[in-house]
Curated annotation (Swiss-Prot):
The keyword Cell membrane applies. GO terms for cellular component: plasma membrane. It comes from Archaeoglobus fulgidus (strain ATCC 49558 / DSM 4304 / JCM 9628 / NBRC 100126 / VC-16). Keywords: Cell membrane, Membrane, Transmembrane, Transmembrane helix. It is found in: Cell membrane. This is UPF0132 membrane protein AF_0105. Belongs to the UPF0132 family. The chain crosses the membrane at residues 5-25, 35-55, 58-78.
Length: 103
């Protein structure tokens, strides 16, 4: 599989495909980076959604906004990975890079 396709697919189901590609990929730093960034980013969005669900009134208002931000982030990350770009999200991109051993 081409690196750009594998990188884009690592975002498809968020942390699920991110973890799968982390386990399967042994050589490509590009794929490992995008898989790690996907795992950290979208696991974070899931945790944030769960935390917001416990906050009365404001949480209900913020969950759709977080969902929209997550969806836009998801689309941008898939596009950038498919375009062979080492696109780093703020903060999360640096963490992902450190976790895979630097690029």
């Amino acid at each position: 599989m081409k690196e750009n396709v594998a990188g884009a697919l690592s975002y498809l189901l968020g942390p699920i495909t991110g973890i799968l590609f982390l386990l399967m990929e042994k050589e490509s730093q590009f794929v490992k980076f995008h898989a790690m960034q996907s795992t950290i980013t979208f696991a974070g969005f899931w945790v944030l959604d769960i935390a917001l669900s416990f906050i009365p009134y404001i949480g209900v208002l913020l969950i759709p906004i977080v969902g929209l931000v997550a969806f836009i982030t998801w689309l941008v990350c898939i596009y950038k990975a498919y375009s062979n770009e080492w696109f780093k999200l703020p903060v999360v991109g640096d963490i992902a890079e450190q976790q895979i051993g630097g690029v």
